[in-house]
Amino acid sequence: MGRLYGVVEGSELLGFCAITTDQDDDYRAVWDISEMAIVPHRLAVHPSAHGKGVAKLLLERAEGICKERGYKSIRVDTNAKNRATNILFPKLGYESLRPITLTGKPKNMLFNTYEKYVA
């Protein structure tokens, strides 16, 4: 499963996110990747839409898909230096786990991991 979801206002794309079930092997350090989960990737919001709840809308859509499919959690990672998402995820109820490195990225580049359980 992998689809790109967007938030559009008029003819302007305000933000988008790939909503997948893809869990890279690197995630084994944090999660049991044999468990199905929703995994949003590439969450991006146009600067003109910052602070307008666009990222929240996209993550709420991910939650809806998670519930529809009967999965128990949403798992995300973000660059440890991405201040906005490292504030956003806990604010939306995501539990902060531990930083990991990702294959193909510099070893000194850390990615924070988060998980949210849905009912």
Please give the residue ranges for each predicted region:
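Short alpha-helical
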Residues: L14, R83-A84
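Conserved catalytic-core motifs of GNAT/GCN5-like acyltransferases
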Residues: D77-T78, P90-L110
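Conserved acetyl-CoA-binding loop-helix of GNAT-fold acetyltransferases
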Residues: V45, G51-G64, I87-K91
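Conserved GNAT acetyl-CoA-binding A-motif
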Residues: L59, C66-T78
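Acetyl-CoA-dependent GNAT
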Residues: M1-S48, L59-E60, Y117-A119
